[in-house]
């Protein structure tokens, strides 16, 4: 949990959420662009307080070396003072969010949300910039999404769905919902 410790005492936090895109230029000057779906879509830059002395924090810093870049680590913004990065902006309650399900028809840069709450069709399920999670991976909503009259809604996100869904998955939006990590542990 060393990343969590560093996050909780950080002076600043930076998030790089850019897609991994490459461009090539052919001999006739035609530009070709392609996107690679990455497993590690977000890069975090945490600047800990200046008083984080190595001599006093060897255990925390050593626990960062063990997973390094090879193993998955999780950070929970909701349990620190940095929840403003992921704060949900829509009109659903936490219970309504937990009852919604991401559908198997989700693909590419459109996630499909079902089991919608009974709220007015003009109410916002998501606002542009909201963080949502499907399975293990997080996505950023790119446009406002209203409830509408249909049983499902399309939620446009900033990058393509990494793992296709084989069954419905509970919705996680902003600081609300239950996340299941690779080890099967849950946290909110």
What are these regions, as identified by a protein language model?
Residues 1-188:
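Extracellular/virion structural assembly segments
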């Amino acid at each position: 949990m060393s990343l969590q410790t560093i996050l909780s005492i950080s002076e600043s936090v930076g998030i790089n959420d850019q897609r991994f895109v490459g461009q090539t230029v052919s001999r006739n000057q035609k530009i070709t662009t392609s996107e690679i779906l990455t497993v590690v879509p977000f890069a975090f830059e945490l600047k800990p307080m200046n008083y984080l002395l190595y001599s006093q924090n060897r255990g925390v810093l050593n626990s960062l070396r063990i997973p390094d870049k090879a193993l998955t680590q999780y950070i929970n913004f909701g349990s620190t003072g940095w929840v403003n990065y992921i704060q949900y902006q829509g009109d659903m309650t936490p219970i309504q969010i937990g009852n919604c399900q991401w559908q198997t028809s989700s693909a590419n840069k459109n996630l499909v949300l079902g089991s919608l709450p009974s709220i007015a069709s003009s109410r916002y399920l998501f606002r542009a910039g909201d963080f949502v999670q499907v399975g293990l991976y997080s996505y950023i909503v790119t446009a406002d999404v209203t409830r509408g009259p249909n049983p499902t809604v399309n939620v446009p996100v900033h990058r393509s769905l990494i793992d296709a869904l084989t069954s419905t998955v509970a919705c996680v939006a902003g600081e609300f919902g239950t996340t299941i990590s690779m080890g099967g542990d849950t946290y909110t």
